[in-house]
Design a protein with these regions (language model features):
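Acidic, metal/ion-coordinating pockets
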Residues: 19-308, 347, 351-359, 369, ...
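Intrinsically disordered, low-complexity segments enriched in polar/charged small residues
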Residues: 9-10, 228
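Sec-dependent signal peptide recognition
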Residues: 2-9
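A composition-driven signal for long, intrinsically disordered, charge-rich low-complexity tracts
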Residues: 5, 174, 504-505
């Protein structure tokens, strides 16, 4: 026998031996977490914060299982969304970018066997998830996402699977992110990537891995919602996998923050909840005779994690990190000179909306800003602002997008916005409801109550121009734009740069479609800049300017002006607002 053939034969025997179990019984536990969203610490990082689920509480739970089952019989995996979405990851993602990122160190401390990249992890941006993946690799933990493919070579950007040995048992863990990622976030977050549907990809990968690696147990971890199992929703393919996969023992899902367990024949599926409040556990019993698995039993359950029972040794190990994060979160970033009242936006140009427009204008040299309210009926009080207050000032994770729109398209956009906002009224005006409201049953009281006919999340106003909105005119002729904020001419056939949010850029509210941009390709072709989160913009605005002053953010030479006409309109709309929310 030639040397090469001999070596190959020996290698084959070794591989065969590695895949063959000794006769007997094997008991393993698969512990699954997910959707932690950066709730890492057991104690609050904000002043006045409450105790809640945490990674440290989950660590105590995992420690208990390892003590009872034996550490080598426990597999710890995570379904993603771990380093984006709260104050602690913000600090390590965007403020302290020179130290080692905290999440890989936490995952290493807890001895995770594999972690999936969730949609929010991708939303953090290339700089963040590339850095985290690199540091996790150094810690010996794979960040998996087998359906995130590189445009450059068509191969997975992150590993598709990992092989783990536990108690002599060979376990394959295949990991996938959400197939709808491209539609769930700004394109700059996932530049150079495309996302494949989990069907039929996962089954194809399972078949390849089973053939190549010959595992005894196969686990699929997918950051996808459960869904209905009808195969219709890319974002919700959990039950699709559960119903269709063959040769898989455990399916772990996430994304929708549900707590669900289902089983059928030889497969179980678990959806592990959110923010450290739950963990899924699957006990697997294998009986081996003659080197083959002759019996396989699966028992899956969901367990609530007690927030007060956390890993104190882990807390002590990461105390310096906690102190740094808490110092940042509770530190003063700026001041609001005068309280901002959101409900004023319904009937007039308001300080609150001027502030939102000013943020966009401060971040990029745009001609026009288009934005809706973030607070339906709220107040931003005057006074000192700490970082922990930024979420109250700007409660959503929108990002800035700048695109090119013609004057005619901006006019159509505003017409569509105000058509969702107001009715056309005719004389007599005294009792007219100018705001689009309706009466319907309030299920909390059982009584009839006034409600908005449309969502105010789509009531966009504009800054950078001067215009009026005539409530006596029909749709298509209400908005009259007189000129730009600086007094220059507004032209219908001229292209302007306009600031919008990522919420609007993906077609939400239908305003871009009403403006004439029929599909996402039309929108993508017009985009000239993709900016950071507005919370980051707000943080930077405070660091640069020190305060939000209505006299500054409301400068008419910058934000322009707008109003409802005729004269009765603002008071009539205000009366409608009081029907909704009281005086």
């Amino acid at each position: 026998m030639k040397i090469k053939q001999f070596i190959a034969a020996v290698a084959a025997l070794i591989l065969s031996a590695c895949s063959t179990l000794k006769d007997g019984e094997y008991n393993l536990s698969v512990v699954a977490t997910g959707d932690g969203h950066g709730y890492w610490f057991a104690k609050p990082i904000e002043d006045g914060g409450r105790a809640r689920g945490s990674l440290m509480a989950q660590s105590a739970f995992v420690n208990g299982i390892r003590e009872s089952k034996g550490a080598d019989n426990v597999i710890l995996i995570d379904a993603g969304d771990n380093f984006f979405g709260s104050g602690a990851p913000f600090y390590y993602n965007y403020v302290d970018t020179t130290s080692s990122h905290l999440y890989p160190r936490l995952a290493s401390y807890m001895k995770y066997d594999a972690v999936v990249a969730g949609h929010s992890d991708f939303e953090s941006g290339h700089r963040v998830y590339d850095r985290v993946a690199k540091e996790m690799k150094k810690e010996g933990i794979p960040l998996l996402a087998g359906n995130a493919l590189s445009d450059r070579n068509g191969k997975p950007y992150f590993p598709a699977y990992s092989i783990i040995k536990k108690g002599g048992v060979k376990v394959a863990v295949l990991g996938y992110t959400n197939a709808a990622n491209a539609s769930l976030m700004d394109g700059s977050c996932v530049s150079g990537l495309r996302f494949e549907s989990l069907l039929p990809l996962v089954q194809e990968d399972v078949d390849k891995v089973r053939s190549k690696e010959k595992p005894h147990i196969v686990i699929v971890v997918a950051h996808t919602a459960m869904g209905k199992g009808d195969g219709l929703k890319l974002e919700k393919q959990g039950l699709d996998l559960f119903k269709s996969l063959r040769g898989v023992d455990v399916v772990v899902t996430g994304h929708d923050h549900a707590n669900k367990v289902m089983s059928a024949d030889s497969i179980v599926v678990l959806d592990c909840g959110r923010t450290g409040q739950n963990a899924g556990v699957t006990d697997i019993r294998l009986v081996v005779k003659g080197g083959k698995v002759v019996s396989r039993t699966l028992d899956a359950r969901m367990t609530s994690i007690k927030s007060e029972e956390y890993d104190t040794a882990m807390e002590e190990a990461f105390k310096a990190d906690y102190d740094k994060v808490r110092s940042f979160i509770t530190g003063t970033v700026g001041e609001i000179k005068k309280g901002l009242v959101s409900r004023e936006f319904y009937y007039k140009q308001s300080d609150y909306m001027n502030f939102l427009h000013a943020l966009a204008i401060s971040a990029y040299p745009v001609d026009i800003s288009l934005s809706a309210t973030l607070l339906i009926d709220g107040k931003v009080p005057a006074g000192e602002v700490r970082y922990q207050d930024i979420r109250k000032v700007y409660p959503y994770e929108n990002k800035l997008v700048v695109l090119r729109l013609t004057g005619a398209e901006i006019l159509k956009y505003l017409e569509a916005s105000y058509d969702a906002w107001i009715n056309t009224v005719t004389e007599p005006y005294e009792n007219a409801h100018v705001l689009k409201i309706k009466q319907s049953k309030d299920y909390s009281t059982g009584k009839m109550a006034w409600k908005l006919a449309k969502s105010p999340a789509n009531f966009d106003s504009a800054a950078g121009i001067n215009y009026t909105v005539d409530v006596t005119k029909p749709y298509g002729s209400r908005v009259v734009i007189t000129d730009m904020a600086d007094g220059s001419k507004f032209e219908l056939d001229k292209e302007y740069t306009a600031a919008i949010t990522t919420y609007r850029s993906v077609g939400s509210g239908g305003l871009l479609k009403a403006a004439g941009l029929e599909d996402m390709k039309s929108v993508e072709d017009r985009i000239v800049y993709r900016g950071p989160e507005f919370r980051t913009i707000l943080y930077r605005y405070f660091k640069k300017n020190g305060s939000i002053d209505p006299a500054v953010v409301g400068d008419p030479k910058v934000v322009g002006s707008w109003k409802f006409v005729p004269e009765f309109a603002p008071a009539a709309i205000k009366a409608d607002v009081e029907l909704l929310y009281g005086k």
